[in-house]
UniProtKB/Swiss-Prot annotation:
Residues 30-39 have a biased composition (Basic and acidic residues). This is P29. Residues 30-93 are annotated as: Disordered. It comes from Citrus leprosis virus C (isolate Citrus sinesis/Brazil/Cordeiropolis/2003). Residues 52-64 have a biased composition (Polar residues).
């Protein structure tokens, strides 16, 4: 019996199979060592660490679905464009104030004409310095020796006569007593912008409209008005400043259209 010895260096599986078949054909059992070599060896796969993307690295929220809880896909983030805030200019209190400034008119009652909550204004408080109470060609008249007193029987009529007797021009006097309407009260001002300015507060629940508020205020101010004797005391102070003296008779006219000065 002859013994064959051979050495295989890194044999392929096909070569081993042929050797085993040749041995079996001669009715010889295959050595165990050769059988072990013939078994396929599995190469260990080295697991490489999986690199996570930025999206998968974020924690995913689970949301219920038909087959259980599923990972919620991250929502696409939109780039938010932030617009710079524009500086907002404070609007004028009312249109009358803006128009008055446009034409260079004076405000003789700003405390109430520009007050917060003002709903309506009756009677003008904006006028040129040369035209007190918006009366063009304003001319001081000669005062009477006997001044008419404001009476309770005819308060508005006697008030008008009182002004005329003091030397006030015989013109409408509605701008001498402007009324400012607020939510729950009226503010009535006599001789706005003058040294003798009188202010009366009339609750709305005591009168039906601004005319009654004006009348109620006149009755309340009747004694104060009767104590005024000089015309200069009821004229706007800025008008008196353009005169050489408060008693000089001066006629001041303006060639510009006075329609913008009237209410």
């Amino acid at each position: 019996m002859s013994i064959v010895t051979f050495t295989l260096t890194d044999p392929s599986s096909a070569l081993i199979a042929e050797i085993m078949q040749a041995i079996e054909r001669h009715n010889v059992s295959v050595p165990e060592g050769l059988r072990d070599i013939s078994k396929p060896t599995k190469k260990k796969q080295q697991s490489q660490p999986q690199q996570l993307s930025r999206a998968s690295a974020r924690p995913q929220q689970l949301q219920p679905g038909p087959s259980g809880y599923q990972a919620k896909k991250p929502a696409k983030q939109k780039a938010e464009v932030v617009k710079p805030k524009q500086k907002q200019l404070a609007p004028p209190i009312n249109k009358k104030a803006a128009k008055a400034k446009l034409y260079g008119l004076e405000q003789h009652c700003p405390k109430y004409a520009e007050a917060k909550g003002l709903q309506k204004q009756i009677g003008m408080t904006y006028y040129k310095i040369s035209e007190p109470y918006a009366l063009p060609d304003f001319k001081v008249m000669e005062a009477s020796e006997d001044l008419v007193a404001v009476s309770e029987k005819d308060p508005m009529g006697s008030f008008e006569k009182r002004l005329y007797s003091m030397g006030f021009p015989k013109r409408p006097i509605k701008n001498v007593v402007p009324v400012f309407e607020f939510s729950d009260h009226y503010i009535v001002v006599f001789f706005p912008g003058s040294n003798a300015e009188i202010v009366k507060n009339v609750p709305k629940d005591s009168v039906s409209d601004y005319a009654e508020a004006q009348l109620a205020a006149l009755l309340a101010a009747r004694q104060q008005i009767n104590q005024i004797h000089e015309l200069g005391d009821i004229l706007p102070t800025n008008y008196l400043n353009v005169l050489d003296s408060g008693t000089q008779d001066v006629v001041v006219s303006d060639e510009e259209d006075d329609s913008d000065s009237a209410q």
